[in-house]
Amino acid sequence: MSYMIAVPDMLSSAAGDLASIGSSINASTRAAAAATTRLLPAAADEVSAHIAALFSGHGEGYQAIARQMAAFHDQFTLALTSSAGAYASAEATNVEQQVLGLINAPTQALLGRPLIGNGADGTAANPNGGAGGLLYGNGGNGFSQTTAGLTGGTGGSAGLIGNGGNGGAGGAGANGGAGGNGGWLYGSGGNGGAGGAGPAGAIGAPGVAGGAGGAGGTAGLFGNGGAGGAGGAGGAGGRGGDGGSAGWLSGNGGDAGTGGGGGNAGNGGNGGSAGWLSGNGGTGGGGGTAGAGGQGGNGNSGIDPGNGGQGADTGNAGNGGHGGSAAKLFGDGGAGGAGGMGSTGGTGGGGGFGGGTGGNGGNGHAGGAGGSGGTAGLLGSGGSGGTGGDGGNGGLGAGSGAKGNGGNGGDGGKGGDAQLIGNGGNGGNGGKGGTGLMPGINGTGGAGGSRGQISGNPGTPGQ
């Protein structure tokens, strides 16, 4: 077996020597070009002219070969220089890892946690992300499950400085993992993982509920809260995860996750609160869209024909989450999330041949209510209220069957209040009522938030 030892300094020195040799050869080649490629005939006869042309041709041929060799020499020198840099970088990395190993060894042995470095990402065997270094490092991300029913891994928390890891997505029908917390001094919380969608149900049976989204991680002294994960769709939609709280001194609250759609849709999560000194509240998550009603069954045909079945009513739409509160001194409240939309009721089933009556359409349910806007700090404006969702439309009747009733529109959310100086948040508009045999009523607009005690304008009420 043969061995090779590569010393980066020697490779760099050899590359420099090659470059110097190449420069000398190129200079000599250029100096000889005029004397070897443009020879004058020794006399005025034809023989002298042919001899001069022959030697000039040899000189030009040498110059062509010299140019090719110079290009090859440059490429070889460049490759050698790059190799020297690669070896030097690899050795520096090895030295860095060795130094970090020496630094981290005491805390790893005593506390099971390094002093500097990022936490490991979660795996199927160990789904939770590892914690970051005590002094510096980000938390590892939680594992996103591929097996139904298993909760996503939790993101690892940072130490003194660093961001929390993101939570992993849940498996089918399971909750998402929570985001890890940011560093005690500086760093943002990790985002929550999405909830898993619920598997479809068997014929005549509801589907499995979707998982809730994971909550966003909390920041330490300075930093933003993590966003909440979205709820999974399913027989009942999962709730959106709440946004994480911001750093104690400064930072914005995390935005909340959206509720999952489904038979009964999930509510949106609440936005995270800001810190003490400055920062805005997080936005509330939107409510999920209600599931549509199923079609009624057809009646049997024959001597005694059956009537068609009534279409199924829709599920309930999810409500929007509330906006997060601003920091105590400076900041605006977060906006409330919009209410989920209602869906259309199921179509009535057809009557059996021979005189069966068609079924009535299913009723649409009300749209979700908008979330309230967050309260402002001493200096800042309140958050806007969320818009109410539109009510679902009634399903069509089959034959002589009646159309279903429309659902009412969801109410708009209230605007957030200002404190000392600032404007109140505007109220959210109410949703429109759905169409049907008896149309739904439009939702009521949310009230505007109060103005600041010293100056500011009150929020405009929703329509």
From Swiss-Prot:
Disulfide bonds: none annotated. Residues 1-93 form the PE domain. Residues 231-320, 408-463 are annotated as: Disordered. InterPro entries: PE-PGRS_N (IPR000084), PGRS_rpt (IPR048996). Pfam families: PE, PGRS. Signal peptide: none annotated. Belongs to the mycobacterial PE family. PGRS subfamily. This is Uncharacterized PE-PGRS family protein PE_PGRS20. It comes from Mycobacterium tuberculosis (strain ATCC 25618 / H37Rv). The gene is PE_PGRS20.
